[in-house]
Each structure stands twice: as structure tokens, then as C-alpha cells.
């Protein structure tokens, strides 16, 4: 999760987020080099009085400033297209989780388990336990198995929402009447926080998302327990 005075992105816990951070650093370095070159040229123009008033054209320079930007754009586009392909790749997901946005809470349905569904509301401040985070805790955490491909189906019951968990590299719009899908996976156990990222009304800021990734055997025990309780 984000921390005060944090510089940079959140720590990655999924392969997609690791690729996004690497691409961010790659693109940022290219932008830094271009900006440095432009500032250097501007400083030269401001500090020298030498001009070439007799120069009418310069074919070599024109070729350089046409070909070089094209090469730079290709260097940025190829990694970006690779990541776009990875985000849309769905290979035999272990389970399917459906997230439904409401004003102002989330509902979750485990499609592979019978009658396994619940609502997830924000925990009021006066109910928080020591060590919990204000505006980020929920009454029912979404529990998932780690090291497993999970397909998310995301929609909305009323207005536009957006289901986002930064450390997993997932941000998908929840649109009424439409199912959007995303793939997520965590390489380690733990709690991961997110929020609705689409302004959806007066309580938009009170729609947190909490994912708890646990080991496979613990997840099966958890799912069995919820099924027994719901009987």
C-alpha cells in the first residue's frame, strides 16, 4: 500500500505490475535523456552569439531529427504492446471472481463455488482495531489463493465505478450492463489495498478494496467454512 511521502510506485506483487514498473523506468529514462538534450541545446542558444544566417537547408540534420524520434517511439511502443498483450492473456484461470460496484460498496461472487458471495462495506472509524488503516479497511475481506491465475469479472449495478488495486497492476472500469475482465495473481501472501478509482457520487472515497492472499490449502478451508455458515 502507499505510504506518506512515498516516491515512486507501490511494491509489485504480481508479474504484470513488475512489468509495468520496468516499463515506467524505461520510459522515464528516455524522457530524462530527451529533456536533458533539449535543455542543453537551449542553454547553448542562450549563451552563444554565433549564428548561421547563410544556412538555407541542412538535409543531414533533417534526416536525423526525423529518424531518431521514430526509433525512440519504437523503443517505447514495443515494450508497451508486450504489456498490453500480457494484460489480456487468460490461460486457464484457477477461479473466477465477480466484483459488482454499488453506491457505495462492493459485492463479490465466487463463480466456481456454490452460494459463495458477500458484500464488502467500509469499516467505520470507530470500529477500527489498533494497526488498521482509516478509509481502507472493510468488514469482509476478499480472500484469494496466492500463486494462482484469477479471472476478475467486473461490472456495476448503478453508476460507473473502477476496481483498482495498484500493487497488483489492476485497474478496470465497472460499467452498468457490461462485464469487463482482468487477470490478477499474487506471488506472495498478504493484504493488498485498493479503492474505487472513478468518481461515483458523494461517498466515492468510501469504497475501499481489501484482498487477502493466502495459501491454497488455507483458501479451501476458508471457502468450505463460508459454505457451511451459509447453509
Swiss-Prot record:
Keywords: Copper, Electron transport, Magnesium, Membrane, Metal-binding, Mitochondrion, Mitochondrion inner membrane, Respiratory chain, Translocase, Transmembrane, Transmembrane helix, Transport. It is an enzyme of class 7 (translocase). Cu cation A2 binds at residues 196, 198, 200, 204. Gene3D superfamilies: 1.10.287.90, Cupredoxins - blue copper proteins. One of its GO terms (molecular function) is cytochrome-c oxidase activity. It is found in: Mitochondrion inner membrane. Its cofactor is Cu cation. It catalyses: 4 Fe(II)-[cytochrome c] + O2 + 8 H(+)(in) = 4 Fe(III)-[cytochrome c] + 2 H2O + 4 H(+)(out). Residues 46-59 are mitochondrial matrix. Residues 1-14, 88-231 are mitochondrial intermembrane. The chain crosses the membrane at residues 15-45, 60-87. Belongs to the cytochrome c oxidase subunit 2 family. Component of the cytochrome c oxidase, the last enzyme in the mitochondrial electron transport chain which drives oxidative phosphorylation. The respiratory chain contains 3 multisubunit complexes succinate dehydrogenase (complex II, CII), ubiquinol-cytochrome c oxidoreductase (cytochrome b-c1 complex, complex III, CIII) and cytochrome c oxidase (complex IV, CIV), that cooperate to transfer electrons derived from NADH and succinate to molecular oxygen, creating an electrochemical gradient over the inner membrane that drives transmembrane transport and the ATP synthase. This is Cytochrome c oxidase subunit 2. It comes from Aotus nigriceps (Black-headed night monkey). The lineage of its organism: Eukaryota, Metazoa, Chordata, Craniata, Vertebrata. The gene is MT-CO2.
Amino acid at each position: 500500500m502507499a505510504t506518506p511521502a512515498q516516491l515512486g510506485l507501490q511494491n509489485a506483487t504480481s508479474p504484470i505490475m513488475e512489468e509495468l514498473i520496468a516499463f515506467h523506468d524505461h520510459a522515464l529514462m528516455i524522457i530524462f535523456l530527451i529533456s536533458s538534450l533539449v535543455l542543453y541545446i537551449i542553454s547553448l542558444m542562450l549563451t552563444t552569439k554565433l549564428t548561421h544566417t547563410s544556412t538555407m537547408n541542412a538535409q543531414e540534420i533533417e534526416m536525423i531529427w526525423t529518424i531518431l524520434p521514430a526509433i525512440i517511439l519504437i523503443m517505447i511502443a514495443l515494450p508497451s504492446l508486450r504489456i498490453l498483450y500480457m494484460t489480456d492473456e487468460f490461460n486457464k484461470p484457477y477461479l473466477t471472481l465477480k466484483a459488482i460496484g454499488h453506491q457505495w460498496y462492493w459485492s463479490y461472487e465466487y463463480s466456481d463455488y456454490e452460494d459463495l458471495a458477500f458484500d464488502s462495506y467500509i469499516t467505520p472509524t470507530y470500529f477500527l482495531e489498533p494497526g488498521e488503516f482509516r478509509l481502507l479497511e472493510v468488514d469482509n475481506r476478499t480472500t484469494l489463493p496466492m500463486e494462482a491465475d484469477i479471472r476478475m469479472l467486473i461490472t456495476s449495478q448503478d453508476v460507473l465505478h473502477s476496481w483498482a488495486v495498484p500493487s497488483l497492476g489492476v485497474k478496470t472500469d465497472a460499467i452498468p450492463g457490461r462485464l469487463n475482465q482482468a487477470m490478477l495473481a499474487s506471488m506472495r501472501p498478504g493484504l493488498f489495498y485498493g479503492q474505487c478509482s472513478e468518481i461515483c457520487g458523494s461517498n466515492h472515497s468510501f469504497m475501499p478494496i481489501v484482498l487477502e492472499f493466502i495459501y491454497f490449502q488455507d483458501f479451501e478451508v476458508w471457502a468450505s467454512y463460508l459454505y457451511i455458515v451459509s447453509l
